[in-house]
């Protein structure tokens, strides 16, 4: 990757970006100053042109770390430290183009860019899920050739079920059923709890980290219509050694980006770090426990520091066609259907020491970062700290309209079951049941306007 950037070139591009911000309607600036006009497959991996060359290059180094292939110790190419059990060789292996993973469309295809959490009833010492005694916190399908066998293969069987709108139009929803085969380390047991998860896009995460805890607490306490509630998750902060408000992950189980990244390295690639210093091997996995390991911790500052900055500094794509008449009408319908009661259109960041330019920005992520009961149909029946099985964090909607451009698909929700935005809405239940019913009763022209608005984000 070429990194020869001059200060004058960066300054000129920054001036251009600031001019764009000044000339653009504020509602189009999804990430405030950290908004990018990029609309192609690279739209989820942009940042602003920093006035200093050091940070500009650090963002490029961070993407290199994201793409870096991690290998088993003693292999000749790549960074040592992956495994013995893992699900990917690099961050980009699942966060494709800094975006979402994919779900297998056919029942004979094993999962490769998503994961399955596992646990048993009860809580661990920190208040989180109790790891499965044989398989730990998640199923890892990759091992070490000739030494450590991967734990299992996971497949998804799909069942189609029709849903009819009030005007007679029918949509087919697909319901997933996990099938876990080739279990190497013994049976799972009838009390095992499962949660399939698709990787989420890496855009605007620093901006979300910059939103003060007090804002989330105020959103939780605010009165809401139609039985909507919303609550924060209280999770374990491994660095501070105390409970904290969670905001990252499908159930808001990590309080900050440092922990989110280190947890992903540990659980998905078997890479140890200062926060997670031991391998993922369980007591019964003797070959895993006896396997050669790289010097600890495996995730060092040379990889982690630029990667953290990359994730923190990633910008958000600007809205497209925000002033279009039908898009405006769709936005009004979005509010009238109470979608905005959870998908909060606008937040403001506080002081943000990692990137001061992100401080006091008005952003439009369309999330409250709170947990909401989404109904039995979306339940994984697996508690995670204070998040119940039916509760999920409100997914940010910014960048949604470019999902297919970036990743080639629009598989949405925590397990990728929704193939379109319309399907995602129709899976909503629980606190979102009112919104779903309103959508079902809308005339087709109104449904199209609402979807057009969502596609503009």
At which residue positions do the language-model features occur?
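Bacterial N-terminal signal peptides that target proteins for export
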Residues: 1-9
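Short intrinsically disordered, low-complexity coil segments enriched in acidic
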Residues: 2, 17-20
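Bacterial N-terminal signal peptides
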Residues: 8-17
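Periplasmic c-type cytochrome electron-transfer domains
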Residues: 20-457
